Amino acid sequence: MLGWPNNPLTSNVDIIITGSAQTNVLLPNDGGSLGPRVIGVLGGLDLHGIPHNVTWTRLASPALAGQTSITLSQAVDWVAGNEILLTTTDTRIDHVERCTIANVSSGGTVLTLTSPLAYTHTVIHNVFPNGEVYHAAGAVGLLTRNIRVFSQSTAAEKIGFRVLVTDYSTDVWDPIGATYLSTYYKGYARISNVQFVGYGQFIDAPYNDKREGIHLYNLGDWNASRPTYIDSCSFDTGYYSAYVFF
């Protein structure tokens, strides 16, 4: 647990996932394997970082290659040192750019960057005679969060970490009654304003056990006693999909 939904953590915390890609995490009593480099949630997981007024927005004006500042369509509370992502506005996925903020001005709408842009990110804004507005612009997202979960695996491995929220049944020995009791666990996770770095596992896994960064499996309908959600998080440098409800 790091913070509560109504009382988020304000300090900086890194959760570092270590271990070999060949070492599986095993459930007790021959309950099976959760796989390698995994946070297995069979109880409750709460991770809540500092919320932001805006986590992603769009460019207000074109950002040309060579520029060291960009103008946003919304005011943000981001600060110098934060990392951001600018999406491509052409057909080249490698024209997505990762930048670091050097300064924030004009009430939070102008970001000065630590290095010039490598590519142009366009904005198209048209108002038609009937009053309809067409606006297409590159997106700008905040990557930085004060809580980070990341893997020490190398990019060549393509096997990062994952968070598996699921259920589990086993028999637990009752020493008083001298018998085994059937016990059922069901996990839940409330996660907000967390940065996941190096998530997901690019491996050949069973259909119902794919290796997304966050895998929510067999949790049933939403329940007030197990209110699972993912809110305002960033997913950075992954090897599989960010999350899935299965």
What are the residue ranges of the model-derived segments?
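Beta-strand/loop edge motif enriched in small/polar residues
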Residues: M1-F246
